[in-house]
A protein has these predicted regions:
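Short, intrinsically disordered low-complexity segments
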Residues: 33-71
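C-terminal structural segments of small proteins and small subunits
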Residues: 57-95
Length: 95
């Protein structure tokens, strides 16, 4: 399943640390497409782990998370224009 994750973490007492932890959790499951936006292709078990980790990291009184579920037919729903074209997460990858 394809999920777009966006977040806004307040930079105050402990905010910078929370921001780094949220970004790291997202990087483990997807690719950054903007500063606080990640495209993640995950199975249901991975999604549960990622979502739980993100919710645990934020301060719900100061920070916010948004999850956009684009499903398995996401290629028809995503259009990219401009620089920084992303990598195909489902295609072959040479490391």
């Amino acid at each position: 399943m394809f999920v777009l994750v966006s977040y806004d973490v307040a930079i105050d007492d402990g905010g910078a640390k929370r921001l780094r932890r949220v970004a790291k959790a997202c990087r483990n499951y997807g690719q950054r497409v903007q500063y606080s936006v990640f495209e993640c292709i995950v199975d249901p078990a991975q999604w549960t782990v990622l979502r739980d980790n993100l919710i645990r990291e934020i301060d719900e009184g100061k920070d916010s998370l948004r999850f956009y579920y684009l499903g398995s037919n996401w290629r028809r729903r995503v259009e990219h224009v401009g620089a920084k074209k992303g990598i195909d997460q489902e295609g072959p990858m040479i490391v």
